[in-house]
Amino acid sequence: MNTWNELTVHVNREAEEAVSNLLIETGSQGVAISDSADYLGQEDRFGELYPEVEQSDMIAITAYYPDTLDIEVVKADLADRLANFEGFGLATGSVNLDSQELVEEDWADNWKKYYEPARITHDLTIVPSWTDYEAKAGEKIIKLDPGMAFGTGTHPTTKMSLFALEQVLRGGETVIDVGTGSGVLSIASSLLGAKDIYAFDLDVVAVRVAQENIDMNPGTDNIHVAAGDLLKGVQQEADVIVANILADILIHLTDDAYRLVKDEGYLIMSGIISEKWDMVRESAEKAGFFLETHMVQGEWNACVFKKTDDISGVIGG
């Protein structure tokens, strides 16, 4: 019987996606998020009793490592790399690392119970790869394996990115997805009618994971995945560029994005905590973009900028 090491990281909610990605990079085969905010304000229904919880900025991210890895070495590596996040302006809070051994059957049950089909936007629903789900009329299904890496698509930053794509895509566009992670934004772009999608990520693990998720979704052979450092060296012009990454990294792609976005095209950015919003907005406007839409969900911000000479329909125009 195989055994696994279950490792739980208690961090600031702001660091959810970054830490989840890091856990996968260090060998985890799956992650699950426990957030007290998910229970706040919910009424008991369908026989379920939600626990009494208080608002907290901390969340618990549970990762599952095969017993072939030395969990103490993993914990030491994680502690060092989490400390480096502060240098990117991402506050992790007081990090605690707890671990325990788990048999394979328990891991399978514990891991999958966190994930159910989730309607994200008017048209888009994300469905775990193992779920037999029948789409309703007009519903577009994105199949993902949440255990692979890089989130499930239900984080506020991803939700707002998907909503923005749904608003700007009309069919036939070329899209560039910067920092693709799970590939969810590329898959959504294809389902929403984009003609060609180019997905880039600096992490080779993300490139593999994105391709595996893409392969699970029929009709997505118009998505081209490659390793890349933001937009460096990219010559392909696009109608839409979307990037759901840290604010301190977003400011380094706005100039290249303006170079590549076609006239009347869009730059969608997400992953921006409120205290970094002004910095990102100023970077995009300095590059030549005009703000068309600003979205806020909790402490997270997302935006749609437009490359246009007609500013009558943009914020402040």
Swiss-Prot record:
What are its GO biological-process terms? methylation
Where does the protein end up? Cytoplasm
Which InterPro entries does UniProt cross-reference here?
Answer: Ribosomal_L11_MeTrfase_PrmA, Ribosomal_PrmA_MeTrfase, SAM-dependent_MTases_sf
Residues that span the membrane, as ranges: none
Q: Tell me which residues bind S-adenosyl-L-methionine.
A: T158, G179, D201, N244
Pfam families named among the record's database cross-references: PrmA
Q: What is this protein called?
A: Ribosomal protein L11 methyltransferase
Q: Which gene holds the coding sequence for this protein?
A: prmA
